[in-house]
Every structure is written in structure tokens, then in C-alpha cells.
């Protein structure tokens, strides 16, 4: 197969455009996209886009390759056990047809594709929340050739990843910004069952919320505090090049031709100017034109030069401002018919008694076709002008005849049908030859399917354990007094940077003095500043007697393999193990225990391999983790860890904690999940480790919850007390997501 790739060097860019339909696909190619990312009939993160049928996707592959462009297919959702078995069969025809790369979120999907198609390029989706060099090194062994950076990364962070790993980088340059780190959002999922991890986000972040302080006093009314402006990076080409970013990604698979092709055309203009060394100052007129194609309360340059900021937030109703109808119509007329046809040259030779000869060529490919034998004319001989007129026709092919040479012996004849057939066969053969280098004829050897993770099968079966994760130090005392808790997980979020080492040591010793195992829960997001500091302190923390670590992202997984190898490495629920393939893949990375994803329902959990899984029985689900800060954006940053609330239009209040040590916000569900009454069901499903997550609870509340668990665990209680009525949720256990 032809390597339809590129040389990743500074000052070289790929302009990557979205397309939600074949018509938009052809338009963005015409507008100058180097590559196009599309969703097929299954497994894409834009379930409500038109998307491509299998036949349309095959046509798109041919169309792109004829013009020397690339196609990336999105398989960037989380797949359940019932679905992952289909993914390789789904990809097979596109793989054989020359698919350039596949974009993935699910670690199980990633490893399954790499095992089945080892020569297919894999790009990690922004849904994998890649923020550091550690993840790049981890993924490099799985066929990953490119990482789509989390939108929150600065240009300096991207530069460091590129320089330290050599991994090809893709960054968003234009379009909508999510409030939450992509892949970490359960807001839409928990409120209405429409999961962003399944391509069905309902965007509750675009709704108004009142902001309340820690004592539930309202201080900001009906503000769009979770709604970010659209980003535009057209003025940052120099910075992106200096950072080593190769692929510039435009968001918008739900957009139509005027927006998609229009935005591509303006970026194409300034990329070409930049690459040619000319002046790249974006004119005010062009910037206004891009703005007029669509924006949400104006533009922001995103996180390239900042960690967060109130100027990125709309605060007012995030409607798109009025667009320029005349400009949109002009773009539609220019690009709706697709790219200009490919110029070809032809040579036709007609000699009596010999087979008709026709040669057609582009700049790089040439084909020769022989037709029927040329006859002596009985009546009207062929005229060069008539033959030329007929042979120059290219119809609905992608070609246009640029030059045609005709050599006709006097007095010869060939039926018009024979000439037409010669022309059609030649152009069809030319197209076939142009596409042949991209296609894969070989069929990779299928690997034997492994029903369960072999790395797990070899492990000694452990007794049941009950973990308590303490998000505040005040919760530790009742946890230590609980007879049911066997293991305590001290969350790094509960400690300030200045005192963490002393307080962690004190708390770890207190846990071990109670003959309980002590574990460390690492931060939810692991950016460069955090990584440098944590790398320094982690060996000392390990020596405090920690039995293992709870990791929440791929960067921490890679780091834990270095520091905690030989100890327990537990992945949190947001390192998603929707399917057994993911369980096996993580086990291969040294993971000893995974947390059951929060979006699986009862039947899906039962069909899952659970022998090495932990189930969260109690806790406030984190709905969003954001680099933004509700407190800082509404009251100013005071660098103090605290609690506030968001109140929606139904008067429901969602707690928000700001973690200043790591500079991120976590928005929690309004009610905690409570699954104590289902304990025996989980045991029958093979789960032996259970967990309670404490976030904002007081010591008294923590003690009451632990007592309630003990009563269910010893069989003395079968129903929840009346005072718990309407104070908890079952999460997705009884409903699940689409």
C-alpha cells in the first residue's frame, strides 16, 4: 500500500477538516483540506450527524486519494462487550480500500485494531484526555502514530511533548470548545442518558445556571458559566509551528458546507502564505469573514496562551451571532460541486488493420488500452475533429482532458461505440491505477480471541475488600473506625501542596496502625506542572508504606509503572473498561484492578469480566473536570480550595469543588449514587472489591454512610431508611446509556 503520509517537520502543516456528509467532504477537499475526518455508520462521536454509509465512505476514500488527500475514520466512542466484537469486521473493507488512519478513544478498541490491523495508523482522540509526555510513550507501542491533544494544553506544553517524544501532534484550531476535558464528561449522560462517550451529548453546558457559595447563597443569577466561546487559531500559525504541531484540526462535523468549506478556505490561504514565508498577518476583513461564518459570542484563542480565564466564557446566552448570508452563498457556489477535475493528456493512434491504441496519463500515472481492430472505411471515414470531440468527453469521471494527440490514418473507420468504450475503459483504468497504491490486498492474520485477560487469569484470587476514598481529611477518622473498611485511599486532592508530604505521612501511618491497607489516589488531570512536582515526591510517598495507587489518566498509569511496579495499580472509572478487551489491555500495562465504568447498567455489568474489577457503591459522580474555575471566573482567583454550587432551571444544585493545587474544577452530581442494596448482585457478577468515595461529606455524614453499608453487608438491613428517600440515585445501574 502507498504510504499516503508526509514528513513531519517544523513549518509543515496538515489542514484537517470535518465532514458530516459526502457533499461536505467534497466541498472541504475543494476548499483545500489536506485530510478529512469522518464518521461512518457505527461507533463515531457524532451520532446525530448525517455520517457516511459504508458505500459513501468507500467513495470518499477514492475521491480523497485521487486528489492526494487523506481520510481518517472516527471510532472514538466507548464500546460495550456486545459491540467490540464487530469493530474489526466493520473496519475491514475500509482498511482494504486504503483508510489512512482511525481515530479512537477506547483503549480496548485501540489494542484490538492494532492486533488485527498492525499496519493501520491509529490516532488517539482528544477523548482520551492526553496531556503529557508519559501518555505518548505509553501509546507508541500500540501503533499510535499521532495524538490529538487535549484542547486545554498550551503551546508550550505541546512543544515539550513533541520535543521529548517525537510523536506527531494534532491540535484543534477552530470551532466549539467544551467546558470539560473531553472524555471526562458525564453531565449529559447522568441528566438524560445521552452520553458524550457514546457520541450523544445533549450539551447541558450551554444552559444557564445560578452560582451559589458554600452556604448555598446565590450570588450570580442565570449565567452561562459553563458555556465557552468558539476558538479561532488562525492568528497562531507561527506559535503552532514553533510548538511542533503538525495537524491543524477544525471542529464541526455537524456543520454544513458554507461553514466547513468557508473556514477551510481561509485557513488554507494563511497556511499557504505562512509556508511560503510570506506575510501572514490576518487581515481584518478576513477575520471578520471567518467570524461571520459562525461564532458563539465572538472568538477566543483557546488555551494556547493561558490556563483558563473568564474572557473565554460567554456568560450570556450562547447563540451564534448573525451570519453573512451573501458570503455563505458565495462559498456554496464555489465549493458545492467539489474539487476541480484532474487534468489528463491523451494519445490516440488509429491505423488500419491494427488494434486501436489509446494512452491516457496524469503527471504521475499512465495507462494504455487496446481496442478493436481499425477497419478500412466503406463509406464515411473518420475525421480527426469528430474523433477529438468524442474522445475529449470525460463525463462524470474525476478527469478533464487537458491535451489530446490524435494520429489517424486516412480512410479508416471505427464505430462510435468502439471509440466510446475505448475512452471509458482508459479513464476507468487510469482511476484504478491511481488508487491501486493506496489499497491493501493482504488480509492480516487474525489473532485468536482471548475471552478473558490472560494477565488476570494468572493472578491469585483475593478476598473481598472494601475501599474508602477520602476526599477531605475530616473523613479519615470515621473511616478508620469502621470495621468494614479494609483499604483506605488517600486522595491527593485533599491536601495542599505546601503540607502534603507531612500530612500524607501522618494519615498513612494512621491507616496502617489500624491494620488497613493504604493507597494513594492521584489527581484527575496530570499536566506538565503537576508532573514535574509529583515525579519528585512520588518515590518518597511510595516509601511511606502505600500498598498501591489509584490512577486517573494515562500519564499517571505510565508513571505508576515506574514508581509503583510490583505494587497494586488500580485504574479509576474514567480510564474506561467498558469491554473485556480494555480490561486485558490495561492488565498488560501492569494494572491489577480496574473500576467498573459508571455508565454501564446491570445487564452490561453481568456480561463483563469482573474478577479484577472494583465497584463504586457510594459517592457523588464527577460530572465534569475542567481547567476553568467557576469560583475564579465569577469572583476572582484567591487560590483557596473551596466549594460552590450551580443551580439549574429546575432548582437542582450541583456541587463544584475547585482544586487549586492542580488548577481544575470538578462539578459533581446533585445526589450521590447509593448501591448498597445491590451488593449481592455484584458479588454474583464476580466483583470482590467495593468502594465508597467521600467528597464533601462531614465526619458525621461519613460515619452514617459507613454504618449504613455495614448493615447491608451483614444482612441486618435490606431497605434504605426513610430519611434517605429522594436523597440518592442509582446512577446508570438500572438504565444505562444509549
What would you call each of these model-derived segments?
Residues 2-31, 35-46, 60-61, 67-95, ...:
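Surface-exposed amphipathic alpha-helical tracts and adjacent flexible/coil segments at the periphery
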Residues 49:
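A short acidic, glycine-rich active-site loop
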Residues 111:
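A cross-family signal for key residues in well-ordered alpha-helices
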Residues 125-129:
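Ser/Thr-centric signal marking residues that sit
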Residues 133-134:
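Conserved nucleotide-cofactor-binding alpha/beta core module
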Amino acid at each position: 500500500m502507498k504510504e499516503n503520509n508526509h514528513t513531519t517537520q517544523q513549518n509543515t502543516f496538515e489542514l484537517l477538516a470535518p465532514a458530516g456528509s459526502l457533499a461536505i467532504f467534497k466541498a472541504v477537499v475543494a476548499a483545500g483540506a489536506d485530510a478529512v475526518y469522518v464518521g461512518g455508520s457505527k461507533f463515531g462521536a457524532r451520532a446525530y450527524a448525517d455520517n457516511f454509509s459504508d458505500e459513501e465512505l468507500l467513495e470518499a476514500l477514492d475521491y480523497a486519494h485521487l486528489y492526494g488527500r487523506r481520510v481518517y475514520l472516527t471510532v472514538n466512542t466507548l464500546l460495550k462487550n456486545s459491540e467490540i466484537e464487530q469493530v474489526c469486521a466493520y473496519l475491514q473493507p475500509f482498511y482494504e480500500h486504503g483508510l489512512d488512519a482511525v481515530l479512537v478513544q477506547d483503549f480496548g478498541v485501540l489494542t484490538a485494531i492494532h492486533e488485527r490491523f498492525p499496519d493501520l495508523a491509529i490516532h488517539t482522540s482528544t477523548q482520551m484526555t492526553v496531556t503529557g509526555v508519559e501518555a505518548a510513550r505509553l501509546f507508541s507501542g500500540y501503533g499510535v502514530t499521532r495524538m490529538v491533544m487535549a484542547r486545554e494544553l498550551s503551546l508550550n506544553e505541546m512543544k515539550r511533548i513533541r520535543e521529548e517524544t517525537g510523536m506527531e501532534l494534532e491540535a484543534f484550531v477552530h470551532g466549539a470548545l467544551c467546558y470539560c476535558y473531553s472524555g471526562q464528561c458525564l453531565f449529559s449522560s447522568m441528566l438524560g442518558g445521552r452520553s458524550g462517550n457514546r457520541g450523544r451529548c445533549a450539551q447541558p453546558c450551554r444552559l444557564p445556571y445560578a452560582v451559589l457559595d458554600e452556604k448555598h447563597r446565590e450570588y450570580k443569577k442565570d449565567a452561562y458559566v459553563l458555556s465557552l466561546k468558539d476558538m479561532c487559531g488562525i492568528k497562531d500559525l507561527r506559535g503552532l509551528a514553533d510548538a511542533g504541531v503538525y495537524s491543524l484540526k477544525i471542529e464541526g462535523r455537524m456543520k454544513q458546507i458554507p461553514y466547513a468549506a468557508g473556514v477551510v478556505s481561509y485557513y488554507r490561504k494563511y497556511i499557504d502564505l505562512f509556508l511560503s514565508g510570506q506575510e501572514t498577518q490576518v487581515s481584518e476583513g478576513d477575520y471578520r469573514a471567518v467570524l461571520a461564518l459562525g461564532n458563539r459570542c465572538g472568538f477566543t484563542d483557546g488555551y494556547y496562551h493561558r490556563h483558563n480565564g473568564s474572557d473565554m466564557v460567554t456568560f450570556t446566552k450562547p447563540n451564534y451571532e448573525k451570519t453573512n448570508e451573501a458570503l455563505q452563498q458565495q462559498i456554496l457556489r464555489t465549493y458545492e460541486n467539489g474539487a476541480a477535475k484532474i487534468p489528463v493528456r491523451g494519445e490516440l493512434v488509429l491505423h488500419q488493420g491494427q488494434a486501436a491504441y489509446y494512452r491516457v496519463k496524469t503527471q504521475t500515472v499512465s495507462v494504455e488500452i487496446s481496442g478493436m481492430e481499425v477497419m478500412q472505411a466503406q463509406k464515411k471515414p473518420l475525421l480527426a475533429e469528430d474523433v477529438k470531440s468524442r474522445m475529449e468527453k470525460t463525463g462524470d469521471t474525476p478527469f478533464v482532458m487537458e491535451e489530446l494527440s490524435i494520429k489517424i490514418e486516412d480512410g479508416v473507420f471505427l464505430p462510435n461505440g468502439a471509440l466510446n468504450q475505448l475512452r471509458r475503459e482508459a479513464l476507468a483504468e487510469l482511476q484504478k491505477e491511481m488508487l491501486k497504491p493506496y489499497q491493501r490486498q493482504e488480509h492480516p492474520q487474525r489473532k485468536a480471541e482471548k475471552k478473558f485477560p490472560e494477565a488476570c487469569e494468572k493472578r491469585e484470587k483475593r478476598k473481598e475488600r472494601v475501599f474508602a476514598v477520602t476526599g477531605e481529611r475530616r473523613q479519615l477518622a470515621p473511616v478508620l473506625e469502621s470495621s468494614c473498611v479494609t483499604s483506605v485511599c488517600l486522595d491527593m486532592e485533599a491536601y495542599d501542596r505546601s503540607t502534603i508530604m507531612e500530612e500524607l505521612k501522618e494519615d498513612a501511618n494512621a491507616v496502617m496502625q489500624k491494620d488497613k491497607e493504604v493507597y494513594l489516589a492521584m489527581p484527575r488531570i496530570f499536566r506538565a506542572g503537576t508532573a514535574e512536582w509529583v515525579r519528585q515526591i512520588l518515590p518518597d510517598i511510595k516509601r511511606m508504606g502505600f500498598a498501591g495507587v489509584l490512577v486517573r489518566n494515562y500519564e499517571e498509569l505510565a508513571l505508576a509503572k515506574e514508581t509503583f511496579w510490583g505494587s497494586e495499580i488500580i485504574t479509576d472509572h474514567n480510564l474506561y473498561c467498558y469491554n473485556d478487551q480494555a480490561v486485558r489491555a490495561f492488565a498488560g500495562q501492569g494494572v491489577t484492578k480496574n473500576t467498573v465504568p459508571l455508565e454501564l447498567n446491570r445487564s452490561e455489568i453481568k456480561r463483563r469480566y469482573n474478577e479484577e474489577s472494583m465497584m463504586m457503591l457510594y459517592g457523588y459522580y464527577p460530572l465534569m473536570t475542567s481547567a476553568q474555575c467557576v469560583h475564579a471566573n465569577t469572583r476572582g482567583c484567591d487560590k483557596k480550595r473551596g466549594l460552590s454550587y450551580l443551580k439549574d432551571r429546575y432548582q437542582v444544585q450541583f456541587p463544584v469543588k475547585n482544586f487549586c493545587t492542580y488548577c481544575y474544577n470538578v462539578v459533581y452530581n446533585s445526589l450521590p449514587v447509593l448501591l448498597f442494596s445491590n451488593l449481592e448482585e455484584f458479588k454474583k457478577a464476580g466483583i470482590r472489591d467495593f468502594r465508597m468515595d467521600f467528597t464533601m461529606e462531614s465526619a458525621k455524614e461519613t460515619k452514617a454512610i459507613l454504618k449504613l453499608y455495614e448493615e447491608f453487608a451483614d444482612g441486618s438491613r435490606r431497605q434504605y431508611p426513610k430519611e434517605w428517600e429522594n436523597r440518592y440515585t442509582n446512577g446508570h445501574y438500572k438504565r444505562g446509556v444509549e
